[in-house]
UniProtKB/Swiss-Prot annotation:
Its EC number is 6.3.5.3, 3.5.1.2. This is Phosphoribosylformylglycinamidine synthase subunit PurQ. It catalyses: N(2)-formyl-N(1)-(5-phospho-beta-D-ribosyl)glycinamide + L-glutamine + ATP + H2O = 2-formamido-N(1)-(5-O-phospho-beta-D-ribosyl)acetamidine + L-glutamate + ADP + phosphate + H(+); L-glutamine + H2O = L-glutamate + NH4(+). Residues 3-223 form the Glutamine amidotransferase type-1 domain. The active site is at C85, H193, E195. GO terms for cellular component: cytoplasm. GO terms for molecular function: ATP binding; glutaminase activity; phosphoribosylformylglycinamidine synthase activity. Keywords: ATP-binding, Cytoplasm, Glutamine amidotransferase, Hydrolase, Ligase, Nucleotide-binding, Purine biosynthesis. It comes from Staphylococcus aureus (strain MSSA476).
Length: 223
């Protein structure tokens, strides 16, 4: 398995994503936003940061980058796509995930560890966790308030697309939502950073199982 780690101007978690992929036992390669092909890749990791300086709004300018059409193609083919923080914002901007990310209710940038609950462990991203398991991931965002209409929220609930919730909501997200998947279950977006939760020495290794779950799910289908 080989992941493409996208790199935009202002990305600052691309190396963490790369490290997470390698740590889970697969290949990874950095891919510049100006590239026009993801041929040969089995999945996409869209890292956090401040793509294009968050001008207009977070993820807006990245959403029209040349590489995005290929991200959509891989998603349509059922390949795993994970967007974290700014990556989540980009996924909502390009329509692969519903809703939007707004300014935190506090209007402050939040940077700390947060306790989260796995509320759906039947996905390619969470199948190594226990249902209801509590995990610790770092958060680092100013626009992490997940918002959606009541209609979209009911669809998310009906389709079990909500996979991760905050235990102590730090940003005002609708129903404490921290992470969701698309209807097909192969595209995932979350504001917390599992790629920064790989070592107990750094405070938490709760994120290891998320990347291992992605690899496990892919291998079950292809090996």
């Amino acid at each position: 398995m080989k992941f493409a780690v996208l790199v935009f101007p202002g990305s600052n978690c691309d190396r963490d994503m790369f490290n997470a992929a390698i740590k889970s036992g697969v290949e990874a390669e950095y891919v510049d936003y100006r590239e026009t092909s993801l041929s040969g890749f089995d999945g996409v990791l869209i890292p956090g940061g401040f793509s294009f300086g968050d001008y207009l709004r977070s993820g807006a300018m990245a959403s029209v980058a040349p590489i995005i059409s290929e991200v959509k193609r891989l998603a349509a083919e059922g390949k795993p796509v994970l967007g974290v923080c700014n990556g989540f914002q980009i996924l909502t901007e390009i329509g692969l995930l519903p809703g939007a990310l707004l300014h935190n209710d506090s209007h402050l940038f939040i940077s700390r560890n947060e306790e989260l609950e796995i509320v759906n462990n039947q996905t390619a991203f969470t199948n190594l966790y226990e249902q209801g398991e509590k995990v610790i991931y770092p958060v680092a965002h100013g626009e992490g308030h997940y918002y959606c209409t009541d209609e979209i929220y009911q669809q998310l609930k009906a389709n079990n697309q909500i996979i991760l919730k905050y235990v102590n909501n730090p940003n005002g997200s609708y129903d404490d939502i921290a992470g969701i998947v698309n209807k097909k279950g192969n595209v995932c977006g979350m504001m917390p950073h599992p790629e920064r939760a790989l070592e107990t020495l750094l405070g938490t290794d709760s994120g290891v199982k998320l990347f291992e779950a992605m690899v496990k799910s892919w291998r079950e289908q292809h090996v």
